[in-house]
Amino acid sequence: MAGLSFADSASLHEGRPLLLPSSFRESVTFKDVVVNFTQEEWKHLDPIQRDLFRDVTLENYTHLVSIGLQVSKPDMISQLEQGTEPWTEDSCIPVGPLEDWKKRAGNSVSSLELDISEEHLFSETVVTNSKRDDGSLEKLQANQQMLPREVQITEKTAPTCESNLSVSSSFITQTEVALDQPSTKTRAKQNSHPVKKEKLCKCNECGKAFTYCSALIRHQRTHTGEKPYKCNECNKAFSRSENLINHQRIHTGDKPYKCDQCGKGFIEGPSLTQHQRIHTGEKPYKCDECGKAFSQRTHLVQHQRIHTGEKPYTCTECGKSFSQRGHFMEHQKIHTGEKPFKCEECEKTFTRSTHLTQHQKIHTGEKTYKCNECGKAFNGPSTFIRHHMIHTGEKPYECNECGKAFSQHSNLTQHQKTHTGEKPYDCAECGKAFSYWSSLAQHLKIHTGEKPYKCSDCGKAFSYCSSLTQHRRIHTREKPFECSECGKAFSYLSNLNQHQKTHTQEKAYECKECGKAFIRSSSLAKHERIHTGEKPYQCHECGKTFSYGSSLIQHKKIHTGERPYKCNECGRAFNQKIHLTQHKRIHTGAKPYACPKCGKTFRHCSSLAQHQKTHTEEKPYQCNKCEKTFSQNSRLTQHQRIHTGEKPYKCSECDKCFTGSVHLTEHRSTHTGEKPYNSECPQTFSQSTYLTQHQKIHSGEKLLGCEDCEKAFQCHSALTKHQRLHPAVAAVGTSLT
């Protein structure tokens, strides 16, 4: 064979076809440098090995075309370019001279498992030539990364169908075929030339070097953005054929990798391997800093960034950085507004497929994750993990500023914003800023009125899924959160946390205006509105504003007439749970609040507080119009309506208006005939004040005395009527002690 000239070598390097003598072209074909696999053999290759095989085969074919050795495109090349699997039928694999190989191996077995390593697939190739001039040889050797590489195939077991794995030495001088038994892990090395591991392939963009040319080609796609593998269904493109094949299974629904434990299917083999660690509990990746172990290496890498503080993913829109690529991708959808994943049940859209999957479990009621401690089930793994920390008390995330620990990293991140005061999320409607995106999303529902979460028991709708979960506990009366100190149970974790502080008496949040301390930061924020006069919650019906959201919710029930809390004794309904609790004491006769001065007992804490002012004569609330003082702010508000003439409470039956809600409630009983207040005798009353007056008949109590004749009466109205009998009518009766 004639030697390659310097010009020929340059043509090869520049990618131009290199025409060789006909004797050389006839001696080497694509079949001489290709390895065929059956479907069974192909299954034994992992994704990295398959991808490696594709790159090597395509590269070899490209070089054959470049030097003029291949004209027509083989079917295998078309399959590889389209991203399909290139295995062939058993009958299509030619039977070749493997007898010598079997004799050398000294073993005969039944099934074939191919272990193709990158080291073997990319071992150096030497093109022999007896008459090359030294200059051409040096140039050709400098460009060896452009030439096909040798293929070394390690066979773990021999095939039932003998494959022709011999390669013509005219083009590739040496092909290693070695037997590797799984029990011995030793290979029969038949190549006299050791594998070279110099990193000769260097990227011109970033300088990174690679041992193998195909690895450099894959790497360069990160700079060029080249994605040659395109999906015919959705036109999405990929840089690697293996990624295209996995993606196409999304369209076909093919999940060939099944879990033996639970039957769950997966698109990729590595996903199955990771999933199986849930059943085995295997966590092979351990953090050197804190000793925490993980089932996936990617999770360890992400976790280690907590210690290093590394945030390699930066948003070009707002400059915010993230430690995880998934969080970065999710964040970018905030700017684009992209929500590609849609629920077919309620048409709600999501930025992530995992969020859609978890949301769909709301419709199906599926709860696959069960707690072994208490038996409670959850529809998502993250919710289950958070719940499990309640039992273990684990709080691995600690704030560097104040030392407070949290069970979730997201809670730590949110907490740290209390130190920095950062509020990066602004509402476009009202301009209000929030520390967290989730808080902004919840706030936006106030403007839109969106309530996608509906209770199946009573039909009530909620803006947030968590609110629906909490509401359902009214029907189920579930109280899953129990205090370890006193055994008291609560429906909500926040209530338990608040209650536990009563044991420790911890009041960490202090008001800068008056020095009053609070257990919760939210309580401090509400208290501060007393000083600022801020009332951010407005009723759309009447325009009235409130300091607290809960007050607005309660107020709205006046307009809607909603009364969800019903008394089982008399059927009377209330718009607030606390009113029902107070009402039940009428039936039970419970008066848990006692005055320490005189021992008088009351059903309500507010009644006790009002009564105690009779001992101190404290009346801190003064009317600006007539300077009359009151012991309660509500009494002052009601009194001021005398001056303004305001009567905001209207009867839906007769349109009569009243200054106070209590008066409206009492008036409604005239229409319904309802008399819910009863005492020792069978007599019932429509108003609690009538009952109080009546009970004095049984007790013989007469507290109001006439100044003229010292006659005593049980009620103020009776005293007023009596005083009209005297020539000089007194204005006010005095209280007897």
UniProtKB/Swiss-Prot annotation:
There is a cross-link at residue 185 (Glycyl lysine isopeptide (Lys-Gly) (interchain with G-Cter in SUMO2)). SUPFAM superfamilies: beta-beta-alpha zinc fingers, KRAB domain (Kruppel-associated box). The modification Phosphoserine is found at residue 117. It is found in: Nucleus. Its main location: nucleus. One of its GO terms (molecular function) is zinc ion binding. Belongs to the krueppel C2H2-type zinc-finger protein family. GO terms for cellular component: nucleus. One of its GO terms (biological process) is regulation of DNA-templated transcription. A zinc finger (C2H2-type) spans 201-223, 229-251, 257-279, 285-307, 313-335, 341-363, 369-391, 397-419, 425-447, 453-475, 481-503, 509-531, 537-559, 565-587, 593-615, 621-643, 649-671, 677-698, 704-726. Keywords: DNA-binding, Isopeptide bond, Metal-binding, Nucleus, Phosphoprotein, Repeat, Transcription, Transcription regulation, Ubl conjugation, Zinc, Zinc-finger. It holds the Pfam family KRAB. May be involved in transcriptional regulation. This is Zinc finger protein 184. Residues 28-99 form the KRAB domain.
